[in-house]
């Protein structure tokens, strides 16, 4: 790689990191050309030498943030037993990532993406991010007969909507319960969905599960 190309990539990286830092700390409302340029240490005119507009930068941030979320989930679940246990752990790690970075959650799920040049691609990355970070375990559970292949898409959809709903309420402070209660409710919801759809109740052993949105009781 030539020196000019190396310098170009480095300057692009400064602008990208500056945008990511603003999104994480202050949200999309803080992202404008001058703020990005100030944080990157360059003039705002320089930004347009490397990017068409701010939307280009924000889309790259979406892609990078998804990669960070995926890495976070992988790092926090690699020691878990494969199957349902790692699937549950992956869902929790996904939630923990957004609790740690509420600005990213706001960008992903609360901002209008209508002006994005690559709106369709960005929407797909965002909307199915939970499914994707758990994809290996979904496939593993199907391959081992833990979950039935014809039900997996329904289970994914139910868990995705329940998880994002909880996060939306928690991050927007529409509920008063603490983080520990968030995780407790996450487990209850996840268990209820898995137990209602999987041949073995999503657990080892037999028995019949009785559950609703607040309780999950296994009757031997």
Give the location of each predicted region.
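N-terminal intrinsically disordered/low-complexity leader segments
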Residues: 1-10, 74, 201-220
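Short amphipathic alpha-helical segment with a characteristic S/N-K-E followed by hydrophobic residues
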Residues: 15, 30, 53-58, 69
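Short hydrophobic/aromatic patch on the recognition helix
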Residues: 40-51
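Amphipathic alpha-helical linker/stalk segments
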Residues: 61-87, 106-109, 119, 130-143
